[in-house]
């Protein structure tokens, strides 16, 4: 795998530059504030790959232009991707701020009475607003004593939320989206918009025809020893579901083995195309060994591939999961049907949480009345207002079965660095692999089938592009729901029972698109969505504001909405502010 240095967090202690007593009295307190911030972030955060987060602190406190420039030189040489400026006192506003136009930045002004940290915070934010370089404000709710070195809970929450989102921004910058194929069945998300990736995400698009995948398979441009390992792993761990095809379309054992072999090869080759593989250089394929520096990918599949070759279901499901024949590892981000916009939502979720993402069709709204009519069952609990059936043949991560457990024994999806091999095995054991339905996939394949455990908090997201407006983000926090087995079976067999299912109940607010479950479904902007573990909508909102992507729909509590301070100057309604600010500032990487 090609190694590119991970972005670091820069910590900028700023100080009142007046000597003869003022600066000298503040040096230790200011630098300790920077060190405490760095300690918090390195203890609480990891990169999505699992590596520890590193912080870089300015060599000196920053009182003016010269020290700000020296700090910037250090940060530029150490791949600092976001900055946090900290101070307990008055400093010189525009002389000390971080002026990099694309680097996410926050300022923590200490809430104390001895020195006016809050006054500097306000002055510096005014400079940021006037110069068109938005910054996030961090200011504790309660006054602290000057010698109090603790970080209050509300300050910690903002520091961590800012840092998670800022690391996501910095990690995406300079990477690529691998578009393997073109437009799938007219799905708009697979009309890959290069300008969106370049201007809003700082990414490139690598467009590769699906014949490149065919070439790699046919010419054995892969690690043959690894293929044997993958086959042995599948033989040990795969349970096969019923073949629902008519007799004339069912494959014999030899044909089924060939389909499995090619499905695993597809996973290997797509992975190698994304990140490279030094083993390919060993067999003389140096160019192919480099990969495309892809942090996310999409596979068109339907129909130009799937009408004659095995579909991408197995490859996508395995790649998006946190484990394979090599053990537990970081999940990849691979969007089925090359839905690049759902792929971006997956990428955001993975970068914010380090977890696998569940790709799904937003297939059916089931009202309580309809379920009672069809099954005789009356919905209650989380499901009492109705549920949405999330189901897709393709790339739902097997982690989505929720056979992993948190510290209290509850079902969940964990960051890959916390997953045990036993938990990975449990997810595999909960999954059946069903022969693909011939009417959809003439080339065959295997679709994973599992049922997500109930009562698990999830956040469903989706990015859409609106002509004349640009990208927008949708967010719906809610829970998975467990239905009685007979009820699930009746409902599931009305669609395609060979695919993975999550029954989802969004949290309702009684207003707008969250008036009821029907309205959530009716306002969803496309046929696909992504499930990310936990109620993490607030993190998505912060990330979107950094990228200048307005949020058109969410059910996050207003007190958790955290955006740059300049948004407040764009009107009195916080969602209207978001639209006006994103339009005013334009995409983060303007083109």
UniProtKB/Swiss-Prot annotation:
Active site: 337 (proton acceptor), 361 (proton acceptor)
GO terms for biological process, alphabetical: D-arabinose catabolic process; L-fucose catabolic process
Signal peptide as annotated in the record: none
Catalysed reactions, semicolon-separated: L-fucose = L-fuculose
Enzyme Commission number: 5.3.1.25
UniProt-annotated binding residues for Mn(2+): 337, 361, 528
Enzyme type, top EC level: isomerase
Cofactor: Mn(2+)
Role summary: Converts the aldose L-fucose into the corresponding ketose L-fuculose.
Family: Belongs to the L-fucose isomerase family.
Protein name: L-fucose isomerase
Organism of provenance: Escherichia coli O157:H7
């Amino acid at each position: 795998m090609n190694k590119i240095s991970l972005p670091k967090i820069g910590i900028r202690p700023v100080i009142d530059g007046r000597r003869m007593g003022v600066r000298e009295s503040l040096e230790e307190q200011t630098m300790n504030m920077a060190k405490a911030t760095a300690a918090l972030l390195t203890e609480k955060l990891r990169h999505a790959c699992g590596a520890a987060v590193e912080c870089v602190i300015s060599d000196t406190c920053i009182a003016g232009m010269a020290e700000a420039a020296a700090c910037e030189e250090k940060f530029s040489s150490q791949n600092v991707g976001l900055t946090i400026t900290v101070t307990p006192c008055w400093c010189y506003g525009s002389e000390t701020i971080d002026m990099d136009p694309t680097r996410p930045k926050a300022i923590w002004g200490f809430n104390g009475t001895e020195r006016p940290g809050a006054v500097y915070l306000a002055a510096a934010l005014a400079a940021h607003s006037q110069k068109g370089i938005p910054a996030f404000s961090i200011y504790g709710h309660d006054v602290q004593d000057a010698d109090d070195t603790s970080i209050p809970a509300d300050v910690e929450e903002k520091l961590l939320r800012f840092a998670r989102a800022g690391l996501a921004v910095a990690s995406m910058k300079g990477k690529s989206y691998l578009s393997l194929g073109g437009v799938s069945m007219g799905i708009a998300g697979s009309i890959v918009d290069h300008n969106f990736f370049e201007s809003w995400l700082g990414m490139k698009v690598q467009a590769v025809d699906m014949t490149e995948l065919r070439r790699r398979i046919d010419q054995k441009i892969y690690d043959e020893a690894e293929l044997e390992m993958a086959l042995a792993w599948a033989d040990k761990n795969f349970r096969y579901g019923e073949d629902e095809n008519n007799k004339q379309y069912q494959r014999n054992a030899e044909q089924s083995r060939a389909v499995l072999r090619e499905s695993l090869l597809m996973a290997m080759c797509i992975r190698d195309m994304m990140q490279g593989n030094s083993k390919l250089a060993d067999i003389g394929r140096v160019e192919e060994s480099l990969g495309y520096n892809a942090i996310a990918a999409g596979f068109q599949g339907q129909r130009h591939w799937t009408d004659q070759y095995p579909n991408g279901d197995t490859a996508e499901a395995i790649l998006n999961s946190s484990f394979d024949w090599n053990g537990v590892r970081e999940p990849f981000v691979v969007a089925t049907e090359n839905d690049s916009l759902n792929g971006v939502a997956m990428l955001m979720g993975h970068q914010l949480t380090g977890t696998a993402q569940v790709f799904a069709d937003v297939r059916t709204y089931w009202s309580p009345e309809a379920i009672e009519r069809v099954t005789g069952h009356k919905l209650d609990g989380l499901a009492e207002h109705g549920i949405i059936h999330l189901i897709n043949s393709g790339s739902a991560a097997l982690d989505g079965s929720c056979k992993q457990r948190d510290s209290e024994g509850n079902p969940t999806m964990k960051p890959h660095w916390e997953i045990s091999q036993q938990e990975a095995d449990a997810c595999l054991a909960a999954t059946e692999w069903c022969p693909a339905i011939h009417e959809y996939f003439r080339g065959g394949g295997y679709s994973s089938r599992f049922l997500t455990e109930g009562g698990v908090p999830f956040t469903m997201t989706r990015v859409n592009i609106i002509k004349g407006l640009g990208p927008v983000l949708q967010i719906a926090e809610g829970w998975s729901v467990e239905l009685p087995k007979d009820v699930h079976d009746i409902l599931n067999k009305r669609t395609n029972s060979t695919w993975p299912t999550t029954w989802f109940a969004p949290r309702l607010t009684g207003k707008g698109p969250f008036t009821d479950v029907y309205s959530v479904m009716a306002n969803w902007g496309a046929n696909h969505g992504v499930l990310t573990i936990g109620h993490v909508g607030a993190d998505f909102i912060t990330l979107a504001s950094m990228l200048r992507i307005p949020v058109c729909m969410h059910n996050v509590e207003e007190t958790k909405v955290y955006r740059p301070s300049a948004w407040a100057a764009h009107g009195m309604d916080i969602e209207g502010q978001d639209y006006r600010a994103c339009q005013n500032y334009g995409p983060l990487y303007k083109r």
